[in-house]
């Protein structure tokens, strides 16, 4: 086996597959891609509707648990991360959200020069093949296919939710990934011709045909090898046997927001006190490694449905068999969607320049494990505030790479985060009370009509909120003036040569949306930096900001007003 390559990429996930493809494309560089997991060739991964299976499987995901969270009545939350070709893009819900333009301008304000929306948009476009073709915002011939599932045609509840949002005084948006994120509209997904568009399918399949790319599965990366403040390779373990492989040019960590800080710390790069307590020799004291941890939380608003039109009638074995058979034969129908086909992004209060609350609408009432939430028909809205103030951390407690790191998000630890949740619940009730839902809306199952006071809402959220599985920001990019910055603008580790981190851990702050699309964008942009390519020319595409954002929470009045909030 060859032991020396030009580039070693650790993690064949959302970012690593992109890097493997882009760095191997010219044929002049020899690339080694290391993945702890195995093949993604499974109907449970490839068929979009089966998304709950890989997410909850030991075979395809690291099944992490958080430390007991003080803000959640000491509950520990589930935190699965992909451990398979494609990484979390092979186990996620396939929701395609780029985030708001202001999220990226915020990165620049945080010191990540070169990552403004105008500079990121060309890379979003390069990665994407939007089913309706390219325009100023959307890509038309990129590797990742995106669509709206079944275009909301298989259930009237999708459109009813959009109509209810407009009746509540919010705008409609035809494309939240384009000019206007704020508002109610169709939701987009990484599904291409009925099949999950993971980065394994989109990038790695074609790259694996090249002789200069070597992909090794079932490999545990134990640490980065550091010599004189330079990364020279990695120590790996295969079948219990430990060996070293070397990089002539660079080592690239794409192990995710849990795995990358863990690996840096195991390599002696991180907060000195953490390393010493774990029995690790300090190679480089970098206090920000594992800090700044952010995530999205969500709850399910669940209602009974008066009409027998929801997916609850499709949960039996016969229905699942018919859906699966049609998908196998035709790659369409209910098997070819994640079922989140309408959505919304709104601001919870006046004075917010861009949305901080996201809705996923589902024409069923079920749990994340795919089981029905209650007997009969129902629908639900997944909702949560997406710009939390709370920050957590990840740290190792042992030099053993097989021991899971400690993960503490410190959820809902500020008063503003608590207030955002109260506003979120009241605003959601008001939206679902609008006339467009009258023909469908039955009893409020969850939270329940008795959850009305601040105290009751706080308690219900603490007991019922779940992670949206968006851990991020643990190796943040920024300026050298910030002592907690881990990476420079080119994703290079401060103080260590020939070592970069490229995945969702590099985000300075979490975007308003799901993380797969921005992670792919980061990898596309970083690939150009690694290769020394001239960055794509910045876009001058405009973006919509609510004209009265400083004084108005929304642009209109609700037909059935229920929410009374002080204007700023």
Swiss-Prot record:
Q: Which domain of life is it from?
A: Bacteria
Q: Which InterPro entries match?
A: BetA, FAD/NAD-bd_sf, GMC_OxRdtase, GMC_OxRdtase_N, GMC_OxRtase_C
GO terms for cellular component? membrane
* Molecular function terms, GO-annotated: betaine-aldehyde dehydrogenase (NAD+) activity; choline dehydrogenase activity; flavin adenine dinucleotide binding
Q: State a single Pfam family of this protein.
A: GMC_oxred_C
Annotated FAD binding lies at 6-35
Going by the UniProt record, its keywords in alphabetical order are: FAD, Flavoprotein, NAD, Oxidoreductase
Q: Which PROSITE patterns match?
A: GMC_OXRED_1, GMC_OXRED_2
Q: Where is the active site?
A: 470 (proton acceptor)
Q: Is NAD a UniProt keyword of this protein?
A: yes
Q: Does the keyword NAD apply?
A: yes
What does the record give as the function of this protein? Involved in the biosynthesis of the osmoprotectant glycine betaine. Catalyzes the oxidation of choline to betaine aldehyde and betaine aldehyde to glycine betaine at the same rate.
What family is this protein classified in?
Belongs to the GMC oxidoreductase family.
Q: What is this protein called?
A: Oxygen-dependent choline dehydrogenase
Task: Give the species this sequence originates from.
Answer: Photobacterium profundum (strain SS9)
Q: What is the lineage of its organism?
A: Bacteria, Pseudomonadati, Pseudomonadota, Gammaproteobacteria, Vibrionales
């Amino acid at each position: 086996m060859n032991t020396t390559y030009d580039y070693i990429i650790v993690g064949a996930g959302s970012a690593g597959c992109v890097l493997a493809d882009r760095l191997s494309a010219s044929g002049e560089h020899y690339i080694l891609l290391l993945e702890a997991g195995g093949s993604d060739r499974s109907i449970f991964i490839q068929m979009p509707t089966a998304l709950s299976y890989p997410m909850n499987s030991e075979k395809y995901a690291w099944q992490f648990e958080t430390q007991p969270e003080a803000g959640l009545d000491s509950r520990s939350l589930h935190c699965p991360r992909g451990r398979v070709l494609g990484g979390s893009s092979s186990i996620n819900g396939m929701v395609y959200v780029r985030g708001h333009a202001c999220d990226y301008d915020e990165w620049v304000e945080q010191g990540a020069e070169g990552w403004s929306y105008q500079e990121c948009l060309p890379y979003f476009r390069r990665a994407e093949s939007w089913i309706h073709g390219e325009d100023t915002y959307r890509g038309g011939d990129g590797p990742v296919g995106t669509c709206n599932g079944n275009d909301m045609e298989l259930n009237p509840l999708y459109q009813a939710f959009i109509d209810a949002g407009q009746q509540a005084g919010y705008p409609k948006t035809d494309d939240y990934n384009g000019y206007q994120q704020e508002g109610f509209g169709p939701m987009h997904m990484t599904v291409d011709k009925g099949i999950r568009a993971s980065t394994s399918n989109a990038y790695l399949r074609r790259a694996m045909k090249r002789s200069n790319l070597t992909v090794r599965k079932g490999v545990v990366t134990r640490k980065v090898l550091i010599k004189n403040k330079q990364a020279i390779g990695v120590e790996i373990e295969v079948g219990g046997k430990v060996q070293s492989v070397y990089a002539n040019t660079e080592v690239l960590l794409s192990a995710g927001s849990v795995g990358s800080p863990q690996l840096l710390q195991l390599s002696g790069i991180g907060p000195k006190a953490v390393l010493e307590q774990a029995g690790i020799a300090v190679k480089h004291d970098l206090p920000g490694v594992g800090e700044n941890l952010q995530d999205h939380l969500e709850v399910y608003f669940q209602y009974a449905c008066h009409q027998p039109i929801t997916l609850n009638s499709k949960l039996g074995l016969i229905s699942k068999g018919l859906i699966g058979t049609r998908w196998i034969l035709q790659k369409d129908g209910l098997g070819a969607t994640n079922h989140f086909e309408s959505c919304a992004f709104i601001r919870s209060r006046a004075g917010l320049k861009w949305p901080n609350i996201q809705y996923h609408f589902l024409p069923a009432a079920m749990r994340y494990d795919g089981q029905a939430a209650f007997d009969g028909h129902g629908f639900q809205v997944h909702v949560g505030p997406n710009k939390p103030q709370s920050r957590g951390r990840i740290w190792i407690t042992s030099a053993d790479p097989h021991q899971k790191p400690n993960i503490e998000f410190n959820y809902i630890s500020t008063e503003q985060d608590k207030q955002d949740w109260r506003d979120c619940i009241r605003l959601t009730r008001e939206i679902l009370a609008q006339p467009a839902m009258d023909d469908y809306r039955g009893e409020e199952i969850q939270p329940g009509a008795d959850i009305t006071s601040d105290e009751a809402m706080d308690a219900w959220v603490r007991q019922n909120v779940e992670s949206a599985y968006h851990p991020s920001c643990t190796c943040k990019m920024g300026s050298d003036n910030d002592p907690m910055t881990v990476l420079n603008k080119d994703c290079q580790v401060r103080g260590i040569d020939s070592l970069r981190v490229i995945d969702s851990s590099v985000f300075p702050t979490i975007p308003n949306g799901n993380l797969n699309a921005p992670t792919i964008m980061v990898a596309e942009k970083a690939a150009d930096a690694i290769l020394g390519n001239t960055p794509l020319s910045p876009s001058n595409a405009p973006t919509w900001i609510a004209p009265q954002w400083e004084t108005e929470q929304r642009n209109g009045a609700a037909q059935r007003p229920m929410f009374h909030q002080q204007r700023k």
